[in-house]
Amino acid sequence: MKQYLDLCQRLIDEGTWVENSRTGKRCLTVINADLVYHVDKNEFPLITTRKSFYKAAIAELLGYIRGYDNAADFRAIGCNTWNANANDNQAWLDNPHRKGIDDMGRVYGVQGRAWSKPDGGCIDQLRKIVDDLSKGIDDRGEILSFYNPGEFHMGCLRPCMHTHNFSLVGDTLHLTSFQRSCDVPLGLNFNQVQVFTLLALMAQITGHKPGTAFHKIVNAHIYEDQLELMQEVQLKREPFTSPKLVINPNIKSLEDLETWVSIDDFEVTGYEHHEAISYPFSV
């Protein structure tokens, strides 16, 4: 929790004002932010200086694991984050690759489970990683990437958190996740929950101990209309101890994650928090 608040303070103290052409707003921006999550100690990085929610973040992660390309599928498992991108983005609505209502195109999990090969067919990146790690293999290329510039025009949104690199040392699994851009007051809580949970799940289904998750953010920013709430409310609150994440121990394989697992198989315990803060969201 301290590292999150330190990053927020760093944005205020060291950030440079940058005009964002997409939103028409200014952002205080810093380049390169490194966060570390101790999955081995089960220190779940759910923000405590405001009431935060984890279920939609984990549901979205499940959708990525399953390779979903439709907002309706995400809604069915408890995640509404793709509704607007799939249905209210005019550029995507006009795109000839859009298949209809709720279609997201070739984004995130589609790339992770069915990356197109130039000679035909596709690569299931996640399946390869799970198979290797289950056999105790780390070829120094256990990389799950959603970032495919050759198919950006075939999807509604470029990935923000785009690459997950797994490393097996002895019987302990580690993860390094890369993110190109992050709205710190709103988006980071969502993202860090996913990084933590992804490592915990992958360790569980491949039979290894979870280690450390390293989260690398390139462009970390706070929008001008979020600044006052961050300075005058959230940063003046004392954080509570991190809660714990409890995952159903019956989840034992990638096939389990693809089929019967739901958000009800995840529980957060010991979560103390301050009141919610309604930060403005920039579309």
From Swiss-Prot:
Function as written in the Swiss-Prot or TrEMBL entry: Catalyzes the reductive methylation of 2'-deoxyuridine-5'-monophosphate (dUMP) to 2'-deoxythymidine-5'-monophosphate (dTMP) while utilizing 5,10-methylenetetrahydrofolate (mTHF) as the methyl donor and reductant in the reaction, yielding dihydrofolate (DHF) as a by-product. This enzymatic reaction provides an intracellular de novo source of dTMP, an essential precursor for DNA biosynthesis.
Predominant location: cytoplasm
Reactions catalysed, as given in the entry: dUMP + (6R)-5,10-methylene-5,6,7,8-tetrahydrofolate = 7,8-dihydrofolate + dTMP
GO molecular function term, any single one: thymidylate synthase activity
GO cellular component: cytosol
UniProt name for this protein: Thymidylate synthase
Subunit-structure text: Homodimer.
Keywords, sorted A to Z: Cytoplasm, Methyltransferase, Nucleotide biosynthesis, Transferase
Alphabetized InterPro entries for the sequence: Thymidate_synth/dCMP_Mease, Thymidate_synth/dCMP_Mease_dom, Thymidate_synth/dCMP_Mease_sf, Thymidylate_synthase
Highest taxon in the source lineage: Bacteria
Family according to the record: Belongs to the thymidylate synthase family. Bacterial-type ThyA subfamily.
Enzyme Commission number(s): 2.1.1.45
Subcellular location: Cytoplasm
GO biological process: dTMP biosynthetic process; dTTP biosynthetic process; methylation
Chain residues that bind dUMP: 22, 180-183, 191, 221-223
Organism: Shewanella pealeana (strain ATCC 700345 / ANG-SQ1)
